[in-house]
UniProtKB/Swiss-Prot annotation:
<comment type="function">
    <text>Transcription factor which may be involved in the specification and maintenance of the stem cells (QC cells) in the root apical meristem (RAM).</text>
</comment>
<keyword id="KW-0804">Transcription</keyword>
<protein>
    <recommendedName>
        <fullName>WUSCHEL-related homeobox 9</fullName>
    </recommendedName>
</protein>
<dbReference type="InterPro" id="IPR009057">
    <property type="entry name" value="Homeodomain-like_sf"/>
</dbReference>
<comment type="similarity">
    <text>Belongs to the WUS homeobox family.</text>
</comment>
<dbReference type="GO" id="GO:0003700">
    <property type="term" value="F:DNA-binding transcription factor activity"/>
</dbReference>
<feature type="DNA-binding region" description="Homeobox; WUS-type">
    <location>
        <begin position="10"/>
        <end position="74"/>
    </location>
</feature>
<feature type="compositionally biased region" description="Basic residues">
    <location>
        <begin position="70"/>
        <end position="80"/>
    </location>
</feature>
<dbReference type="Pfam" id="PF00046">
    <property type="entry name" value="Homeodomain"/>
</dbReference>
<dbReference type="GO" id="GO:0005634">
    <property type="term" value="C:nucleus"/>
</dbReference>
<dbReference type="InterPro" id="IPR044555">
    <property type="entry name" value="WUSCHEL-like"/>
</dbReference>
<dbReference type="GO" id="GO:0003677">
    <property type="term" value="F:DNA binding"/>
</dbReference>
<keyword id="KW-0238">DNA-binding</keyword>
<keyword id="KW-0539">Nucleus</keyword>
<keyword id="KW-0371">Homeobox</keyword>
<keyword id="KW-0805">Transcription regulation</keyword>
<feature type="region of interest" description="Disordered">
    <location>
        <begin position="70"/>
        <end position="118"/>
    </location>
</feature>
Length: 200
């Protein structure tokens, strides 16, 4: 039993992040990362493992908890701002600056101890934040084709022309033909499935 007493968190299985892990996560959160993707969580947890034991689920829940705390803090501040005896607060200005997308620069270290590891963290965070911003720019709006299926087809296939689906294409083309069934083998499907595009 004495061998276990020196190790923190072994018995209960709870994750106790090191100061370095908390610092990295906090810097990412302040830089605007709120809901990291699975790939981002994996990369973050891989980096954090250099500072101590961590699992991907720990990183996921850390961000969930901090988003909830931030929402709670904003609600609390809004309630306080609506009361007649509350004045403006310096924290309000700092929080507003963090809410904008332009605030992606990490804050410089405040103590000598922080300054020692700042160079490494600053380079890592700057690259990571740039990567996150570029990745999120690609997520904006995926292009999709709008297709309408006939729910209850009223006719069977009489002509080979009817066995082709038309899909509205992007760019300059109106529609393109895509072979839908194996016409050469002469096999007809039990249902007619036709995808029609309407000018939307």
């Amino acid at each position: 039993m004495e061998a276990l007493s020196g190790r923190v968190g072994v018995k209960c299985g709870r994750w106790n992040p090191t100061a370095e892990q908390v610092k990295v996560l906090t810097e990412l959160f302040r830089a605007g990362l709120r809901t990291p993707s699975t790939e981002q969580i994996q990369r973050i947890s891989t980096h954090l493992s250099a500072f101590g034991k961590v699992e991907s689920k720990n990183v996921f829940y850390w961000f969930q908890n901090h988003k909830a705390r931030e929402r709670h803090h904003h609600k609390k501040r809004r309630r306080g701002a609506s009361s007649p005896d509350s004045g403006s607060n310096d924290d309000d200005g700092r929080a507003a600056a963090h809410e904008g997308d332009a605030d992606l620069v990490l804050q410089p270290p405040e103590s000598k101890r922080e300054a020692r590891s700042y160079g490494h963290h600053h380079r890592l965070m700057t690259c990571y934040v740039r990567d996150v911003v570029e990745t999120e720019a690609m997520w904006e709006r995926p292009t999709r084709e709008v297709e309408t299926l006939e729910l209850f087809p009223l006719k069977s296939y009489d002509l080979e022309v009817d066995k082709v689906r038309y899909v509205r294409g992007g760019g300059g083309e109106q529609c393109r033909e895509i072979s839908f069934f194996d016409v050469a083998a002469g096999r007809d499907p039990p249902l007619e499935l036709r995808l029609c595009s309407f000018g939307l």
